[in-house]
Amino acid sequence: MKFTKKQIERYSRQIILKKIGVIGQKKLLKSSVLIVGAGGLGSPIAIYLAALGIGKIGIIDKDNIEISNLSRQIIFSTNDIKKNKASTAIDKLRKINPDIQFKSFNKKLTKKNINQIAKNFDLIVDGSDNFRTRFLINDYCLQNKKILVSGAISKFDGHVYTFNFSKKKISLFKMLYT
């Protein structure tokens, strides 16, 4: 894979970093991330991943944007109220980086659809707001040897964990919450 002149210019600040360089940037451009939830965590994560040059970004969220979301879901604006979060976020991300692939899923993540949705992504970012979905994503990533980055915020507290199930065969995720 060769960089275009535009890509070299766009990603130059990352390429000059020793821990990223040309090889690392090529890996980013070939990678894919599914973001579950386009809310307070998912929306800024999506912005940064698009700017970083992740080659393919998917977002799944069934919710519509409400005015109460605007104080913390920074990808959305007043004009977006009542629109679907996933598809609206993708529209905004295309403006940030039109050269990468995007896919929106305007639905709830369930046991029935998780494999079809998540199978074509290297890494799953869990920004969901409920334990049922978190456990579903964890179980899927464990069974399919996917990398999971899980985060949650409650009032003024938050956490983020990375589980590399491509290397480990056990999950400590449920132990954190039971």
Regions found by a protein language model. Name each.
Residues 1-178:
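Adenine nucleotide-associated cytosolic modules
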